[in-house]
From Swiss-Prot:
Family annotation (InterPro entries): Biotinidase-like_euk, Biotinidase/VNN, C-N_Hydrolase, C-N_Hydrolase_sf, Vanin_C
Record annotation: effect of changing residue 79 to A: Abolishes enzyme activity
Record organism: Homo sapiens (Human)
Name assigned to this protein: Pantetheinase
GO MF annotation terms: pantetheine hydrolase activity
Catalysis performed (reactions): (R)-pantetheine + H2O = cysteamine + (R)-pantothenate
Catalytic residues (UniProt): 79, 178, 211
A single GO cellular-component term on record: plasma membrane
One of the GO biological process terms: chronic inflammatory response
Proregion residues excised on maturation: 492-513
Similarity comment: family membership: Belongs to the carbon-nitrogen hydrolase superfamily. BTD/VNN family.
Domain CN hydrolase: 39-306
Topology relative to the membrane: Lipid-anchor; GPI-anchor
Length: 513
């Protein structure tokens, strides 16, 4: 015979559990200037590898301690923060540890060597325990295999780019193997199936993924759509790509588009355009850092709602499909944005209404500039196609952007500064997806928190005049279901393919990704 829990006991337990939960929490992210290994593909000894990792951990320890002293409940550190990059499979191996499944119920700080030599995990565990703070870190996992596994690599092991989470008692509570490896990241293996990793705290439910994962459906969208996490923790080593994929720009837009908190911790390496960390709420950025001028790390802290209220679902095509095309009479022209061919129309005058279309996507813009600055040109652009450079992903993008120069051929080139402020803007598009990420980026890679919002009918519009000159106002849409559709044509031009080999390949080789 089964027994049921008395109703009054169940109700009591419910209220006790609610009382033990926090409505808000303090989050920290640390942008780390990693100490890198020597540029050699010859494996070093385990002792040399540990020496380098401990130098980086010494710096991370300072950030973790400082965050805890300021009341942080959780801190996120970057991808590659502990050992850097410049590896092949063999040269990475001395830096790896066997990271067990968190179900083993293990506090490495209390039970050393339970799973072999694991000094990095032990140190991270002790940092979490001794400071009573959740610690999110990125390290490398190794898993032996043999011929009984038909997918076993020739060297007899799997190597994974891995995120780990230790709770405030030092317990290993999450392990995530990166699914979407960046081009050239061949020192690692892809897990056989995408891993959906969550962990629960008294200040909300969390999901975790890494860097390039953010551009794909799994695990990123699944964590929010199906597992309903409150907050994403995001270790990354992100190279900024303007105009649409600057770290602070895109990560804050993803938080707003998916309506979750987002804790992004980036490597600080300005010579490779790697900077940009932030703490983002669904309605606005709370703290962010972008610094191309110094070589120093940066700790950010901010308070967030543990369970952010979910705003109304946006119908991204509602407004745009209800209005007629806003004919400007201006001639359309083509321009390349990160190797994709956009259709543009030049903005003329201090105010106006414009429409530009490509394939199934029509973009509508209404705007008013604070003043017309003669040596600056802005354009409205549309792209509806498959991006195939460093990855394969289908995009629909509506963008108002500053051209690099007054030459229209530079519309879409990377522009980092501007002088034109806008009194108002309203941007919308006939998107074929519910996954649209709203971006507003000001001059010198600054965000505009509290200056814009998205309406339920799909308009990205200003709430006040911009506080700084505008680089871009963008609706960045992803059609995940078309990433591998046979009829999806690439937006990459033949000229862009040549440029890709010239520009992208050396960067990848220099990072050994």
């Amino acid at each position: 015979m089964t027994t049921q829990l008395p109703a009054y006991v169940a109700i009591l337990l419910f209220y006790v559990s609610r009382a033990s939960c926090q409505d808000t929490f303090t989050a920290a992210v640390y942008e780390h200037a990693a100490i890198l290994p020597n540029a050699t593909l010859t494996p070093v000894s385990r002792e040399e590898a540990l020496a380098l990792m401990n130098r980086n951990l010494d710096i991370l320890e300072g950030a973790i301690t400082s965050a805890a002293d300021q009341g942080a409940h959780i801190i996120v550190t970057p991808e590659d923060a502990i050992y850097g990059w410049n590896f092949n499979r063999d040269s990475l191996y001395p830096y790896l540890e066997d990271i067990p499944d968190p179900e083993v119920n293990w506090i490495p700080c209390n039970n050393r060597n339970r799973f072999g030599q694991t000094p990095v995990q032990e140190r991270l565990s002790c940092l979490a325990k001794n400071n009573s703070i959740y610690v999110v870190a990125n390290i490398g996992d190794k898993k032996p295999c043999d011929t009984s596994d038909p997918q076993c690599p020739p060297d007899g092991r799997y190597q994974y780019n891995t995120d780990v989470v230790f709770d405030s008692q030092g317990k290993l509570v999450a392990r995530y193997h990166k699914q979407n490896l960046f081009m050239g990241e061949n020192q690692f293996n892809v897990p056989k199936e995408p891993e959906i990793v969550t962990f629960n705290t008294t200040f909300g439910s969390f999901g975790i993924f890494t860097c390039f994962d953010i551009l794909f459906h799994d695990p990123a969208v699944t964590l929010v759509k199906d597992f309903h996490v409150d907050t994403i923790v995001f270790p990354t080593a992100w190279m900024n790509v303007l105009p649409h994929l600057s770290a602070v720009e895109f990560h804050s837009a993803w938080a707003m588009g998916m309506r979750v908190n987002f804790l992004a911790s980036n490597i600080h390496y300005p010579s490779k355009k790697m900077t940009g960390s932030g703490i983002y709420a669904p309605n606005s950025s709370r703290a962010f850092h972008y610094d191309m001028k110094t070589e120093e790390g940066k700790l950010l802290l901010s308070q967030l709602d543990s369970h952010p209220s979910h705003s109304a679902v946006v119908n991204w095509t509602s407004y745009a499909s209800s209005i007629e095309a806003l004919s400007s009479g201006n001639k359309e022209f083509k321009g390349t944005v990160f190797f994709d061919e956009f259709t543009f129309v030049k903005l003329t005058g201090v105010a106006g209404n414009y429409t530009v279309c490509q394939k199934d996507l029509c973009c509508h813009l209404s705007y008013k500039m604070s003043e017309n600055i003669p040596n600056e040109v802005y354009a409205l652009g549309a792209f509806d196609g498959l991006h195939t450079v460093e990855g394969r992903y289908y995009l629909q993008i509506c963008t108002l952007l500053k051209c690099k120069t007054t030459n229209l051929n530079t519309c879409g080139d990377s522009a980092e500064t501007a002088s034109t402020r806008f009194e108002m803007f309203s941007l919308s598009g006939t998107f074929g997806t519910q996954y649209v990420f709203p971006e507003v980026l000001l001059s010198e890679n600054q965000l505009a928190p509290g200056e814009f919002q998205v309406s339920t009918d799909g308009r990205l519009f200003s709430l006040k005049p911009t506080s700084g000159p505008v680089l871009t106002v963008t609706l960045f849409g992803r059609l995940y279901e078309k990433d591998w559709a046979s009829n999806a044509s690439s937006g990459l031009t033949a000229q862009a393919r040549i440029i890709m080999l010239i520009v992208i390949a050396p960067i990848v080789c220099s990072l050994s990704w």
